[in-house]
């Protein structure tokens, strides 16, 4: 047997077996890793001393429960933005620091950093991975750059223009349902419920050219399995995010919720795969000519555009990539837009003078026109309605925070240093409610977005669609849908606040506990 003298280690002349040697090497490696981690942690703590931090709950939990995802937590975010107007340090337990930015001057360095320097923090987004795959939301590096480049033309106004008719049709369906409910005596409606189905309805038509009738079916029986699965996945991800001990995959997928999540993922993927395979099966050999000819006679849906897309080398997206992007678009497009629209109607219900002015602007635009449809060129002719939308997105941003992880040290304008590996939170809600950026931030005032008032304001003061190279690629799509739905809805209905004030709730998007309820009246029955 091989024998080694380990006397130099201080053990005297001892016969060492290979197992002992392996143990020594392993212990040395582990010690080196611990020392390296300790040095990095100490160095990070030294660099982070310049950042102010609120008082800790205790040494172990630190700031873990400082900002709960409730109305109280959102008020705490506003208070923290007031106390630490440029940003602050919090500890997620005893050893994990996070820097929260709530001021345009400070978040600029993170928001404008390249995707390689400040990629998304996957600890924050990993729960979506089995559902969305490597779509734009979750991909990184060269794959993200390639997909972003390929998909940007997908949201060109020439592609979006035909979707206006889809938005109009889906809105008309919702209005017909509302009129029926109101005649039955149901004048108190949950905006989130109805607008979520509207956005899912329009998205399925825009993405797949598929009419699920989900809005009509909802009043008498459950929507399609696909729609149910989308809603279930959103709910399960938000629920898991609150359950810290189920963040580990090996634990979560042993639970009933984990099984439900995987089942819903399979259902969503099967639906998307079936659409892609059917579309590919029916495509002729000359795909480009076929799709271009189709575009002249029919609206190209998102799947068509993805099939048509190719890079400089002529390479197309794989079926797996197309599925990931379609699923990502469905996820990002329905909940966020529904949240935005719900809070806009809430704010207009609270401020009837602004609601009436928006209505008059739309009525004036469509005066003496046979068709009461909003056309693409009309969107720029609704300045006050646009101001009201933006102010609502400031006060109630659908996405309240985004998370980044620095791959290198980043020096801020004031000389502070964000150490490599530290998680950074861009607090959209905190920035929008920061009194050093927005005077009287809790007041709903659309005139903040008047052209004169915008001058001199940092573009990073208003970031409902994020900012920088990883901003929301579909923001024009979302704003277009919100303008069309809001304009047509104000032509037919008047909104009044409910007796109970909603309590805001931070999940994947900004919701209201128990729904966002408003009193809805047909315009013809309302006082003039």
From Swiss-Prot:
Q: What is its EC number?
A: 1.14.14.-
Record membrane topology: Single-pass type I membrane protein
Q: Which Pfam families match?
A: p450
Checking SUPFAM superfamilies in the record gives:
Cytochrome P450
Question: Quick one: signal sequence residues?
Answer: 1-36
List UniProt keywords, sorted A-Z: Endoplasmic reticulum, Heme, Iron, Membrane, Metal-binding, Microsome, Monooxygenase, Oxidoreductase, Signal, Transmembrane, Transmembrane helix
Note the superkingdom of the native organism.
Eukaryota
Positions of heme binding? 332, 472
GO cellular component terms, A-Z: endoplasmic reticulum membrane
* Catalytic function, reaction form: prostaglandin E2 + reduced [NADPH--hemoprotein reductase] + O2 = 20-hydroxy prostaglandin E2 + oxidized [NADPH--hemoprotein reductase] + H2O + H(+)
Q: What class of enzyme is it?
A: oxidoreductase
**Principal location listed in the UniProt entry:** endoplasmic reticulum
Q: Which cofactor does it need?
A: heme
Listed transmembrane segments: 87-107
One GO MF term, please?
iron ion binding
Q: Which PROSITE patterns match?
A: CYTOCHROME_P450 (PS00086)
Where in or outside the cell it occurs: the entry states:
Endoplasmic reticulum membrane; Microsome membrane
Query: Which family is it part of?
Result: Belongs to the cytochrome P450 family.
Job of this protein:
A cytochrome P450 monooxygenase that catalyzes the omega-hydroxylation of prostaglandin E2. Mechanistically, uses molecular oxygen inserting one oxygen atom into a substrate, and reducing the second into a water molecule, with two electrons provided by NADPH via cytochrome P450 reductase (CPR; NADPH-ferrihemoprotein reductase).
The entry's protein name is Prostaglandin E2 omega-hydroxylase CYP4F21
* Native source organism of the sequence: Ovis aries (Sheep)
